[in-house]
Amino acid sequence: FLSLIPHAINAVSALVHHF
């Protein structure tokens, strides 16, 4: 689960970068 947290943060970061 801990390995999944950074992935989620990266996805959100990419989303914010897109907008």
Swiss-Prot record:
Q: Which domain of life is it from?
A: Eukaryota
For this entry, list what GO says about its biological process.
defense response
Q: In which tissues is it expressed?
A: Expressed by the skin glands.
Q: Where in the cell is it found?
A: Secreted
Species this chain originates from: Pithecopus hypochondrialis (Orange-legged leaf frog)
In the UniProt record, the signal sequence range is none
Q: Which GO terms describe its cellular component?
A: extracellular region
Phenylalanine amide modifications at: 19
| Record's keyword annotation contains Secreted | yes
The function of this protein is: Has antimicrobial activity.
Q: What is this protein called?
A: Phylloseptin-H10
- UniProt KW keywords: Amidation, Amphibian defense peptide, Antimicrobial, Secreted
Family membership: Belongs to the frog skin active peptide (FSAP) family. Phylloseptin subfamily.
